Every structure is written in C-alpha cells, then in structure tokens.
Amino acid sequence: GSGATPALMGICNDRFVVVTDGDAQMNVMLFWRDAIPQDWENIEGQTNPRVAGNALVTMDDANLTAIQSEQGVVVGGYGALVVNNDSPTIPDGYPAKAARLLVAYSGADPAFAPHGMQKFSWDPATRVFASDWVNQEVSSANGVPLVSLGSNTLYTVGGRDGKWALEGIDWTTGESVLTWITGSSRYNTVFAELFIDDEGHIMHGTAFGMVRYPVG
C-alpha cells in the first residue's frame, strides 16, 4: 500500500478510483470503478483490464528515482494532482525513517522544504491518462491541497523563502497565481487539509488552531 487515500474521479461512463502506488518512484493509477467498457484493451504493461491509467511521477526531472506523497491524489474534473513530500536533505546521522518529521515540523526551512507538484489528466476522447504540467517552484510541504473549479485554482500551503505561505496555482496551466506569506510556524499545516467555507474563505488547521484567510 502507498498510504494515499483513494479519490473518485469522473462522470457518465468514465468514472474511476484514483490512487498512488507503493513504488519508490510512485505512479498515479486509475481504476475503472464501474463495469469495464467492453471495447477496452489493456494498457501497455498491465494485465488487469481494471487498470485504466498508470502514469509515472517524474516532476520533469530525468534523474529522479524516488518520490512519494503523503497525501491523497487531488482530483478536479478529469485532472489528478500529486505533490512531493520528500525532504531534499536529511542531516547526517538523522534516521531516514523519521525524515517525514522534518517535513512535518520544519517544512518551511529551505533545507527541508519539499518542492514540486504534477498534474495528470484523463482524456475521454482518446481514453489516455497522461501528464498535463509540472510546477517545480511551489512547495506543498505537508498540507492536503484543495482545488476550486469555480476559480480554477489549486490552493496549498508550503515554504517560501523560509516562511510559511498560502499558494495558488492555475489548475489548467500550473502557473503560480497567488503567494500569501503568512510567516512563522504558527501557520504550519502539519498535514491538515485545506477547505473553503460557505463565504469563500480558505481555511486550514495548524498545531495551534485554525487559520481563516480573507476573501479577495
């Protein structure tokens, strides 16, 4: 198992369960969640027709050999996004099995802030699941991102110049559209999920309580 919570994607005839697998360099996988289409042919490298898509997470880095996310796949429409939760460095003598603690409690520190997110999409016309875009600049340290299809924006929290920040990314292009520097570790999400209230405020938990951002 990968530890990632399954997500549901799709409408009409193309409906899927989306997960990341347990490979060292994770893949994003789609599984038909209803009856498998009668004319469906197994994708390359797969013997199980239930698998509708299998895409390797590369972050556009040809030298990448390992990457993992501690979050479930973020789904919006036929798009599926994963983030990097691996610290870029581990101090000498620090136990590798505890590396997630660096991201959990020091995720804004430039030495430990993970960077990178990659979006994949299912094309109902060609029935192909493939990479859409990569953003290597933005950090999504440990929080669970949120996509708002109304604003076409993905929101997350991560490290920016050694401080915590709310980040907004265009869901279609992957370009950064918002950076709100919040500052100290009081704003560390500590693996909390982002959500939007009825008035459009973005909110998330921290170790010290809730954060609610103004609208506009």
Regions found by a protein language model. Give the residues of each.
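Structural signature of WD-repeat beta-propellers
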Residues: 23, 161, 205-207
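Structural signal for glycine-centered tight turns and loop->strand junctions in beta-sheet-rich domains
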Residues: 4, 12-15, 26, 78-79, ...
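Loop/turn-rich, solvent-exposed surfaces of beta-rich toroidal or solenoidal domains
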Residues: 15-16, 68-180, 184-185
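Hydrophobic/aromatic beta-strand positions that recur at structurally equivalent sites within the blades
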Residues: 30-34, 120-122, 166-169, 211-216
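Conserved beta-strand position repeated once per blade in WD40 beta-propeller domains
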Residues: 3-8, 70-72, 143-146, 191-194
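Long, internal scaffold/assembly segments composed of regular secondary structure
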Residues: 1-66
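Blade-level signature of beta-propeller repeat domains, shared across WD40, Kelch, NHL, RCC1
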Residues: 188-216
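Residue-level signal for well-ordered, solvent-exposed loop/turn and beta-edge residues enriched
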Residues: 7, 126-128, 173-175, 201, ...
